[in-house]
């Protein structure tokens, strides 16, 4: 409840998605002004297609997702990605146990993977932003 997102939800519309149907867990967030979207469950997680349907019904037709590798994989797997932003910085990170941008099982072959076309390159001092749009 201490996060800035929750604290400002009366001024800035804030939607929280969950597959938890226990309304007593929702009410503290609702008291701060958050709107709760209860989705179907898929493999113990939010059903992303159901969430997208609910967001569309309230007029939200695009999202900027800064997710971890698991969420990124789930969105790709469900064909819910049409644009990717990839930032490259001037520092080298990594290691054998480092998380990657896309986790999950991955695609078996390049033909199974969605294809993206480079649409923009921007430089910010020592960093680069690559933007890709899905090829349909």
Feature-to-residue mapping (PLM):
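Enzymes that bind and transform nitrogen-containing heteroaromatic metabolites
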Residues: 1-136
